[in-house]
Each structure stands twice: as structure tokens, then as C-alpha cells.
């Protein structure tokens, strides 16, 4: 496989300048520095804490610091069963996050209500409250699955046109 080096169209531009758009650079930087706020409600939160430990080392992907406040975060990870009483709080946390913001639904309870979906007080999926960007299935999903979801979100942020659905 031959590699061809493209020359700039304008001879005035030197070879060591990278031509890009500001949006592409911002999306690249955003994708490599998520600041997650966690909203752990059940056993999925334990797996989320395990993903932040030394064994899985999510710091190598740029997600090492979980933020204590939604005002400092751009990613919300909802892990566990969301009850009807907790739904307004989830919405309020989402609204307090600065734009751009993303949401990951972690676990079958957050995605669809899980085994408690028939209960009178369980929300059948967090996507009825806030828009969800990535779903991480499982009961409880392993830390590797959460890392896979974070990498999928990274791809979505770098190239937002691929994820647009009309």
C-alpha cells in the first residue's frame, strides 16, 4: 500500500500547517476530555465505580475525574433504576449541565426499566426523561461495556454527522 503525501493547493502554505475547521478541532478536543457526572442508583453504579479503579484505568481515555456537580460536567451516566419520584431530579441535573452535553444510559434498568418495569413507580427507560446518546446494555454491565460505550460516544462526538438520524 503506497502512502501519498498531499501537497497544499497554495504554494504559500508550508508543509507543517494542519488545515482543519474549528468545529472539527473542538469536537476532537471534546471527545478526548469528557467530564462525567455520575447518577448511580443501583448495582450498575458499583460497576461504574469499578471502571474508575486501577484495574480498568479509564484515565487513559481521558475520563478519569467524575465531577461532583452537573455544572462542571458535560456527560451524565445514568446507572440503575429511575423511579417516578427521582425523574424530576434527573431532568434537573440534565438541565444544569452546560452545553454541549451527552447522556449514557447504563444497564437494563436505566434503558428500559429492567426487571422492575411492571412496577407502578418505575420509569420505563431514562430516555423518556432526557435524550440518551449511548445505551450500555447488561445487568449489571461490566466495566468493559462502559468503556466500550464511552468509546462509542467518542466516535459520535468526533463525527456528529454519522449519528444524525431523521
Swiss-Prot record:
Give the Enzyme Commission number. Answer: 7.1.1.-
Sorted keywords for this record are: 4Fe-4S, Cell membrane, Iron, Iron-sulfur, Membrane, Metal-binding, NAD, Quinone, Translocase, Transport
Query: Where would you find this protein in the cell?
Result: Cell membrane
Q: Which residues bind [4Fe-4S] cluster?
A: 43-44, 109, 139
What is the protein's membrane topology class? Answer: Peripheral membrane protein
InterPro entries in the record, alphabetically? NADH_UbQ_OxRdtase-like_20kDa, NADH_UQ_OxRdtase_20Kd_su
Q: Where does the UniProt entry say this protein principally localizes? A: membrane
Q: Please write the reaction equations for the catalytic activity of this protein.
A: a quinone + NADH + 5 H(+)(in) = a quinol + NAD(+) + 4 H(+)(out)
Q: Name one GO cellular component term.
A: respiratory chain complex I
Cofactor binding mode and count: Binds 1 [4Fe-4S] cluster.
Cite the NCBIfam families for this sequence. nuoB_fam, PRK06411.1
Q: What does this protein do?
A: NDH-1 shuttles electrons from NADH, via FMN and iron-sulfur (Fe-S) centers, to quinones in the respiratory chain. The immediate electron acceptor for the enzyme in this species is believed to be a menaquinone. Couples the redox reaction to proton translocation (for every two electrons transferred, four hydrogen ions are translocated across the cytoplasmic membrane), and thus conserves the redox energy in a proton gradient.
**Stated family:** Belongs to the complex I 20 kDa subunit family.
Q: What is the official name of this protein in its record?
A: NADH-quinone oxidoreductase subunit B
Give the organism's phylogenetic lineage.
Answer: Bacteria, Bacillati, Bacillota, Clostridia, Moorellales
Gene that this polypeptide is encoded by: nuoB
